[in-house]
């Protein structure tokens, strides 16, 4: 009987799409829960039968997909951020210099492996050719900063690569929305409003490419790089409502620093409020300004993530 406490998830970048490198040094992942699955697409025969029985179920394709939920910690999910941004990190000249990631057009693929270590023999599901269709972050008062990585994969096998070794998990502390969010900037000015919760979603709008003679997807093609989110703040001033009413664009920046001094700065360069409501929802409740926002590009760049080591 398998136990969740004996499940290991690991991954490695693919040089060739859908091909796991030989004797891979797999990165052991940190995670909360997962929904990685082998999805088989079936169609049913519509043949009319005189005995009134239904026709056979026919397998016409398969793929892999699912989510990995996580607690954000510095340096742990940078490979998935690169996939979500469709670009590579640009490192600074010195190890202590910041590295920068901006949205681009580079498709990055990973092999992701889920192993059930307490099964005899051990069971492994190997998800090949995985892209990150979406990554999201949730920042809520008095809570850890959590997120979800939504993967789409080309194919799956049950054979673990020969000679695989495992790099250890990172050891940086989970980040929280109380002491690790050092500032939230609106147009480079610290926000004075009290934020209850906010979220960021980065979506690549990947779609599968299917071909005659292929049981699995041949590839994925990306659509628009879409950045959006939600923000609930205590209704204290008309500032955000006036921005919503006038369709005023704003730059949103979130600065996060762990207890060791490692930093992330997420910049969304041009956003507008898409919705915003100010409702009294019941007796003895606070009135919240609850809005959603959507971002567009400035010179082709919609989002920028900067990481700086301590």
Segments predicted by a language model, with ranges:
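Signature of extracytoplasmic/envelope-associated structural regions
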Residues: 1-310
